[in-house]
Curated annotation (Swiss-Prot):
Catalytic function, reaction form: 5-(methylsulfanyl)-alpha-D-ribose 1-phosphate = 5-(methylsulfanyl)-D-ribulose 1-phosphate
Gene it is expressed from: mtnA
Entry protein name: Methylthioribose-1-phosphate isomerase
Active-site residues per Swiss-Prot or TrEMBL entry: D240 (proton donor)
InterPro entries: IF-2B-related, IF-M1Pi, IF_2B-like_C, Initiation_fac_2B_a/b/d, M1Pi_N, NagB/RpiA_transferase-like
A Pfam family of this chain: IF-2B
Highest taxon listed in the record's lineage: Bacteria
Gene Ontology process terms (BP): L-methionine salvage from methylthioadenosine
EC number of this enzyme: 5.3.1.23
Gene3D superfamilies attached to this UniProt entry: translation initiation factor eif-2b, domain 1, Translation initiation factor eif-2b, domain 2
Main enzyme class: isomerase
Residues flagged as site, Transition state stabilizer: C160
Source organism of the structure: Crocosphaera subtropica (strain ATCC 51142 / BH68) (Cyanothece sp. (strain ATCC 51142))
Assigned keywords, A-Z: Amino-acid biosynthesis, Isomerase, Methionine biosynthesis
GO terms assigned for molecular function: S-methyl-5-thioribose-1-phosphate isomerase activity
Length: 345
């Protein structure tokens, strides 16, 4: 198995796989300032809720490292400002806010000198990264107990990229697929291309190719046809934020996929760590939905493909109601969305 780590701590700086360059070029971007990390998150050089959380944690440390004061209160005030800048990068991904809050909590609760706080912050960022990798592996393992018994080898449809590139490594939805592949139960992956940024075609397909997992890319509007023809045995997607009732925000197009799966009685699972669950939100109606630049819709490379005078609407996410979700696969266990609240720590 080829190991893919989108966020790497090396020689006192962060290396990010530039996901905007894949699959044509594999490029590492060096990040040594928190401002550059904020830009990398905003421009989706690093993307996927868990990976964003890991990147933000390192961003907090990079910012803390550069604060030039030995006064604890002054240091913490500067750190609060850094946190606010990082929070503004991607509003839907709850792991971003979770990781930043954890880093701030660590700083405020650490007694000692400013230099000691900085040291603990680096250790905390590394711990967040290590924990996420272990969590993804646990999600993959837990999925094996809920697989349909027939057929023996399953064809799984996924949307966007919830793989190693979207996490600390291994992946959530693609982590499930990796585990099913390793267990000998996978026939093939169907990857929605995932308009407008094509994360399925570019990133999920790339990850599968790296590990020689059979993958077929389809356009988003082919999913219904594939289910109608009996080509899909189950659907597994990731999540950017899950409300307490199980409503799930994920890449735009996920909701439609869930409706189609319900129509054709295809099991529809969400794979996500508990850090993606926002228990403070009762329902998905309260999840903020990021809207991105319309150029993602009308431009391919430097070429504008639609006529002048057209208006655009480009939400990055939609919310799938809990009653369309068969189960949520977490690092603890798989639960019915209505039972998600029982896993609250």
């Amino acid at each position: 198995m080829n190991t893919i780590y989108p966020v790497i701590w090396s020689n006192n700086k962060v290396l990010l796989i530039d996901q905007t360059s894949l699959p044509s070029r594999y490029t590492l971007v060096e990040i040594s300032r928190y401002e550059d990390m904020a830009k990398a998150i905003k421009t989706m050089i690093v993307r996927g809720a868990p990976a964003i959380g890991v990147a933000a944690a390192y961003g907090m440390y990079l910012g803390a490292r550069d604060i030039q004061t030995q006064d604890r209160e002054t240091f913490l005030k500067h750190l609060d400002k850094i946190a606010q800048i990082l929070r503004q990068t991607r509003p839907t991904a709850v792991n971003l806010f979770w990781a930043i809050s954890r880093m701030l909590k660590t700083a405020y609760e650490t007694l000692g000198t400013v230099e000691e706080i900085k040291k603990i912050l680096l250790e905390t960022a590394q711990k967040i990264q290590e924990e996420d990798l272990q969590t993804c592996q646990a999600i993959g393992h837990n999925s094996l107990s809920i697989l349909p018994t027939n057929p023996e080898k399953l064809t799984i449809l996924t949307h966007c990229n919830a793989g190693a590139l979207a996490t600390a490594g291994y992946g959530t939805a693609l982590g499930v697929i990796r585990s099913v592949w390793t267990a000998g139960r996978l026939n093939r992956v169907f990857a929605d291309e995932t308009r407008p940024r094509l994360q399925g075609a570019k990133l999920t397909a790339w990850e599968c190719v790296q590990e020689k997992i059979p993958v077929t890319v389809i356009s988003d509007n082919m999913a219904a046809h594939c289910m109608q023809k009996g080509l899909i045995d189950m659907v597994v997607v990731g999540a950017d934020r899950i409300a307490a009732n199980g409503d799930t925000a994920n890449k735009i197009g996920t909701y439609g996929l869930a409706v189609i799966a319900k129509m054709h009685q295809v099991p529809f699972y969400v794979a996500a760590p508990l850090s993606t669950v926002d228990f403070s939100l009762e329902t998905g109606d309260l999840i903020p939905i990021e809207e991105r630049d319309p150029s993602e819709l009308y431009q391919i490379g430097n070429t504008v493909i639609y006529p002048d005078g057209v208006d655009y609407y480009n939400p990055a996410f939609d919310v799938t109601p809990a009653d369309l979700i068969t189960g949520i696969i977490t690092e603890q266990k798989t639960v019915n969305p209505k039972e998600l609240i029982t896993l609250k720590g």
